[in-house]
């Protein structure tokens, strides 16, 4: 099982949680966990587009970055998103140092503004982007995960993560 498979399974479990009212049925839907793929290269506008695509709402990719940011923030608040998982986070390294910093500052902004937990999943090289800024390095920890087999140890790992995460369903 690879990194992407593990996060997809996790995200499917928490992707959409209906809120029920005894008299009215489903009254709302929460998207506590949002899983996206990092843009192919470091680009803030593409990051917002990747977020918006997961809410299945109309938007114009040609809109200014500020409008896309506003839409993404609005939807993440509306759907009570608590965690943003970004697969292939090492793609950020494909941009210039300035572009990398802009994307990382955007992630920091999203984390602060929405009190959002951000999880980046990628290769070992992805950790390099954190070392460009002392504040980023202190904010985002790096955990190396060994290759796992689908056995009891792996299931225990998943259960321990489930207990640590502040998710309710």
Regions found by a protein language model. Give the residues of each.
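Charged interaction scaffolds used for protein-protein
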Residues: 125, 148-151
């Amino acid at each position: 099982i690879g990194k992407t498979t593990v996060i997809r399974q996790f995200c499917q479990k928490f992707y959409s949680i209906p809120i029920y009212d005894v008299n009215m049925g489903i009254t709302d839907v929460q998207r506590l966990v949002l899983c996206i793929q990092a843009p192919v290269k470091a680009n803030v506008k593409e990051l917002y587009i990747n977020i918006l695509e997961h809410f299945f709402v109309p938007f114009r990719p040609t809109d200014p970055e500020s409008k896309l940011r506003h839409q993404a923030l609005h939807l993440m608040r509306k759907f009570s998103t608590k965690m943003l998982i970004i697969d292939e986070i090492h793609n950020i390294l494909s941009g210039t140092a300035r572009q990398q910093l802009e994307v990382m500052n955007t992630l920091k902004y999203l984390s602060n503004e929405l009190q959002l937990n951000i999880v980046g999943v990628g290769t070992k090289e992805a950790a390099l982007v954190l070392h460009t800024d002392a504040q980023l390095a202190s904010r985002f920890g790096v955990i190396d995960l060994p290759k796992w087999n689908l056995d009891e140890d792996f299931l225990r790992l998943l259960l321990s993560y489930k207990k640590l995460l502040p998710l309710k369903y």
